[in-house]
Amino acid sequence: MQQRRPIRRALLSVSDKAGIIEFATALSQRGIELLSTGGTARLLADAGLPVTEVSDYTGFPEMMDGRVKTLHPKVHGGILGRRGQDDGIMAQHDIQPIDIVVVNLYPFAQTVARPDCSLEDAVENIDIGGPTMVRSAAKNHKDVAIVVKSSDYPAIIAELDENDGSLTYPTRFNLAIKAFEHTAAYDSMIANYFGALVPAYHGDTEQPSGRFPRTLNLNYIKKQDMRYGENSHQQAAFYIEEDVKEASVATALQLQGKALSYNNIADTDAALECVKEFSEPACVIVKHANPCGVAIADSLLAAYDKAYKTDPTSAFGGIIAFNRELDAETASAIISRQFVEVIIAPSVSTEALALLAAKQNVRVLTCGQWQERSAGLDFKRVNGGLLVQDRDLGMVTEADLRVVSQRQPTEQELRDALFCWKVAKFVKSNAIVYARDNMTIGIGAGQMSRVYSAKIAGIKAADEGLEVAGSAMASDAFFPFRDGIDAAAAVGITCVIQPGGSIRDDEVIAAADEHGIAMIFTDMRHFRH
């Protein structure tokens, strides 16, 4: 259906005024009558545009501090009236058709994000008339266009010019979908906010009393369909949050290479989030969502060389993340040394990109620089439900550590311990990481017993000819028995960092003392499943 509808009358009422003067000017220049409300009407009038206040159009004033202004039959009749079917009743009541509605809603999300937001503030930023107009126009998209995003303004003007002042049905239908998505997201935010107040339990509704609402409403936007999911028999798509502020795989720009696969995205996320932990030039190589090599150094090339040496076998076909601009020297080393699926960095130099162009199958992403890790929620789907928790942003510094062994760690052991502790946070549990001189020596991931993760880390190091003696070992959770310490001592580990908290901590500490190992407690666990 390509049926066009001429646009002769527009109703504009926006909280976000970005681009509205330019858009309204373009509409007016094309002979379209402008109706508007409150602050939007004043803004347009001040810009010299011919605009009719809705209260003048309806003959009914705004009241109750603006709570009631567009809830009137002349407004909604003009929007909902079916052309060719309701013309008679519209004429009888002097209702003029409204052909395009331009509305965005009160800034509820921004309001409740303020630390000083009260319940009264939140309530006053719940839009009533706006969503009603949006839904009315979207319902009647056969005859009316609804615009909720300023990013659509240029395309609408261009189409009006291409179609003699009309908009096509596909455009109106697409705009209606955006409108329903917009109101659904808006109502979800309100429901989530009120659901977190839980007044029945706390008796204080001035501030949210819980992190998690009674009903969880989520809104994500589809970024791409995927060829398949984790396996080829599974269909899949990638959805992203609407306004992601933090540098992430969701917001990254792909400079070259094939479309990202489901597994590419999952692994790239794991690599990028791990490399964000480090302030020094760092490289993280990931395979199947587990780091297989991590290092920091004075240069990106040195960091990559060290990370690669941890486990060259696993690095084949892996994902590489950096926390600095990718330079030509490092790019050259990568493509001459290994097959890589994805490279992600804050930026890529022109020279590096020219070198990578010789390997067009390599997916190259830039994510921009990051400042701080944003708080958010993690989700895990279970059959029939969803587990929700805060993101694991827990960190420890040297000041947080407790040395529980007889021997104190050396300065180098302490640096290595803090380094491998950061890595262990991103290794699947049970996680054991060996590190020395700011590089991983061996990584044991995902084993059902902690001692076997420790043994695997030692085997990995031995296979690559890496010297374990004098290395630090990190464990993402406490050691339930001394066997993990005995295994570490057997390969030359001299410092262990772990959360502590086992009922057998005394036995584990005693084992460390027997072997002359310095043991550090963090009092923070980092399970990752």
Curated annotation (Swiss-Prot):
EC annotation from Swiss-Prot or TrEMBL: 2.1.2.3, 3.5.4.10
Reaction(s) the record says it catalyses: (6R)-10-formyltetrahydrofolate + 5-amino-1-(5-phospho-beta-D-ribosyl)imidazole-4-carboxamide = 5-formamido-1-(5-phospho-D-ribosyl)imidazole-4-carboxamide + (6S)-5,6,7,8-tetrahydrofolate; IMP + H2O = 5-formamido-1-(5-phospho-D-ribosyl)imidazole-4-carboxamide
Top-level taxonomic group: Bacteria
GO cellular component, one term: cytosol
GO biological process, one term: 'de novo' IMP biosynthetic process
Pfam hit, one: AICARFT_IMPCHas
Similarity comment: Belongs to the PurH family.
Protein name as annotated: Bifunctional purine biosynthesis protein PurH
UniProt lineage: Bacteria, Pseudomonadati, Pseudomonadota, Gammaproteobacteria, Enterobacterales
